Amino acid sequence: MRTNFSFDSAGLTIAGHLSTPEDAATGRRPAIVVGHPASGVKEQAAGLYAQRLAGHGFIALAFDAAYQGESEGTPRGLEDPAHRVEDIKGAVSFLSTLDDVDPDRIGALGICASGGYVVPATATDHRIKAVVTVSAADIGRQFRQGADDAQDPSIIQGMLDAAAAARTAEARGEGVGEFAIFPETEEQARSLGQHGFEGWEYYCTDRARHPRSAKSFTWNSIDRIVAFDAFRFIDLIAPRPLLMIVGTEAVTRHMTTEAIANAQQPKELYWIDRASHVDLYDKDEYVTPAVDKMVEFFRAVS
């Protein structure tokens, strides 16, 4: 069962979908906060995982990031890593108030960029007892260096120039402006390589297109993103357990392997054979083993 809920995150109202089990079991249940990828909304990958987790007996909350989807915040389309981390903590606070949630058994799941946001959230919020990432991405690193670490350094310098100009425009009472996240055509998307194309295919075709999913970010997102280091304090998660799930064909897989190498025990790296980064958003042959693994993981610690 899925119900609409809202909660506070640093003064903004965040829109969420709470997925609950259909069975009639009584007593307090473990709960999972589920964060969506950058540009995503709760109706896409995060909602899918939340519903699947509910099918295994967990209460799961998928929500729209501040400034995006149905959540509050202006300018629309702002991607603010610090606030994204705060959103996760706000979701934990909300779950802690529910009568059917055991506040001592709350975990977090982050997909793509949220895989990079749940790490600092968990590192600094001891209410989160276990954390899982799927296709984790450090959004700051990705903007600085590209998904494959091969980006021309001049690209981010140019974007930072635009971000600086946007802040000046904002101070003058003008609009901050925005930049497109995805190309307009399939041909343009294919020219970006595997990672660029599969992101376009997921967000911009009937595969998973959603009217509230962001197709652009504000220019004043850039300097916030570039200053963010998702895995800098991953060692602080211990002694709480960490599971990182990634596809063997994901262009971003090096971010997961490097991050978990710097984490302390207990930790586990779990590979999904033949899966790409975005395959793990919605393709059942890859999502099912990922869900089965995280259910086993969360049950062991809840």
Locate each region found by the language model.
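The serine-hydrolase catalytic nucleophile loop
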Residues: 38-51, 65
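Conserved alpha/beta-hydrolase
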Residues: 52-72
